[in-house]
Structures are given as structure tokens and as C-alpha cells.
A protein has these predicted regions:
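Structured, hydrophobic secondary-structure cores that serve as assembly/anchoring elements
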Residues: 136-191
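Assembly/oligomerization interface modules of large self-assembling protein complexes
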Residues: 104-146
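Glycine-centered secondary-structure boundary/capping sites
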Residues: 32-34, 44, 98-107, 112-121, ...
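Extracellular Cys-Trp
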Residues: 1-99, 137, 142-143
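Flexible, active-site-adjacent loop/turn segments at secondary-structure boundaries
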Residues: 84, 100-101, 130-131, 169-171
């Protein structure tokens, strides 16, 4: 596990490049989209990429693995009924009372929080007597749940369409054929 900026940026760019284009999908390229979740101690971290999210922590807390803690708390609800905004990382390596282990709150000035927000870097905050990750965004500013939800819908829709195509010897170009194909689309969107 490497947390240096060059690794964070390289892995972010790798994840972004993993999304196939429509032309590639049409040519039969398999869809193996990646999503990268990383952590940084650089308050000026800036890497405008899609399909990657980074969480900031102070250097002395880097071993608490806030990226894994954040992912571990939210990912089990994937893909349905989840938003990555306003979530608390759990089961970190920070010492806590009563057996609860959370990650440590970074010590940030308002200007540093503003810089992290501007660069779309997530961080643990304490507002209204609650600790949570405020934004839940990718490095390009898109919400994490939008990206992952879109991936899930695309995969589910593709699976349902293949089921229809493989289980029906003939799908005509009339209303009933289009209706049959539309059921896969509507079912994926309804799930």
C-alpha cells in the first residue's frame, strides 16, 4: 500500500482509463471498469480524474488507513440505497474508548479545508457535533455514488439484455420486440 502522490495519481489515472468508450464496447471490448480509493497526506493534492476518490489524513494518522475505513463502512451497502456523502469511516486503527475504533480527525485550518474541497479531496470533518466525510466525491467532483451506481446499472442492464437475447430465438423489430428489450432496461433502472 503506497500513499505517495505519484502512486495516488498514477492509480487514479489508471482507474479513469479503465472505462471503455462506446466504440470499444461496440467492438466487443469487455467492460472492466475500475474505481480507485486512496489516501493522501498532501493538503494540496490535485489530480482531476474520474473514477477515483482520495481521502486526506494528517501524516501521523496515515497508518489508520482512512481509505480502507471509509470504503469498509460504505461499500457493503453497494449498490443500492447508498450515498458516500455524510458517512463515517469505521473500524480504523485509531485508539478509542469502549472498544470502538475510528480514524482520527485531521487538524485542518479553514483555508486547508477549502483547498481540499476545491481539489475534490475528501476528509473527515466535525460539524454539528458529528464526525463524517463531508462530500463523498471523486477527484473530478462527481459523487462517488453516481459513478458506482452508473457502473452497476450498466452491468445489470447488459446482463438482462444478454439474457433476453440468449433466451429468445427471434426478437422482431416490431412493438413487441422493442417492448421485450425495453423490459431489461426498465428492470435495471427499477432495481
Amino acid at each position: 500500500d503506497r500513499d505517495e502522490d505519484e502512486f495516488v495519481m498514477a492509480l487514479s489515472k489508471f482507474a479513469e482509463a479503465s472505462e471503455p468508450t462506446e466504440a470499444e464496447l461496440g467492438a466487443g471490448v469487455e467492460d472492466h471498469r475500475k474505481f480507485y480509493m486512496g489516501q493522501t497526506t498532501n493538503k494540496k493534492c490535485a489530480c482531476y480524474t474520474a473514477r477515483a476518490a482520495v481521502i486526506y489524513t494528517d501524516p501521523e494518522f496515515i497508518d489508520e488507513e482512512p481509505d480502507a475505513s471509509y470504503t469498509g463502512n460504505v461499500a457493503p451497502f453497494y449498490p443500492k440505497n447508498v450515498t458516500w456523502k455524510f458517512k463515517r469511516p469505521q473500524d480504523g486503527n485509531a485508539p478509542a474508548s469502549a472498544g470502538t475504533k475510528l480514524i482520527s480527525l485531521p487538524k485542518l485550518k479553514e483555508s486547508e479545508r477549502d483547498a481540499l474541497d476545491e481539489n475534490h479531496v475528501n476528509y473527515l470533518t466535525d460539524e454539528y457535533k458529528r464526525q463524517y466525510v463531508k462530500e463523498g466525491v471523486c477527484l473530478n467532483g462527481e459523487f462517488i455514488d453516481i459513478v458506482i451506481g452508473g457502473d452497476w446499472i450498466a452491468k445489470r442492464m447488459r446482463d438482462l439484455l444478454y439474457d433476453i437475447l440468449l433466451n429468445n430465438a427471434n426478437i422482431n423489430y416490431g412493438d413487441d420486440g422493442f417492448g421485450l428489450v425495453a423490459t431489461a432496461v426498465l428492470q435495471a433502472l427499477a432495481e
